[in-house]
Amino acid sequence: MADNYSKSEVRTWVQETVENIFKGEIKESIKSNIKIEFWYDDEDGFWGSTITLKQWLNGKWERCEDFFFTSYFANYWDMICQPWICDMINDITDEAMKFIHKPRKMGW
């Protein structure tokens, strides 16, 4: 692969993607062979949300990892200041680094 991203470059992309998702500006973002997708389910005011990390492999997007979180807030931008968001961004970055340089089939 021609793209050789550093961990700090990937983390910056992940952080900007999460912030833009929480602002409601985007639902997905792609960097090289990695895609971050966002979806949510609003059931009785309880928001169950998922950020999914996918890789381009064998001509289609394959799921790598799901990051689940819940909120009683309909406004995700209010969540960006929550302390656990930084941990989630770090976790997504770590997973992205596993796949961005070495696409591979998952074991499930």
PLM-predicted stretches and their roles:
Residues T12, E16, Q55-W56, C64, ...:
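Positively charged, low-complexity intrinsically disordered regions
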Residues A2-D3, H101-W108:
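Short acidic DE-rich linear segments
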Residues V18, W84, D91, K102-K105:
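Enrichment for repetitive, rod-forming helical segments
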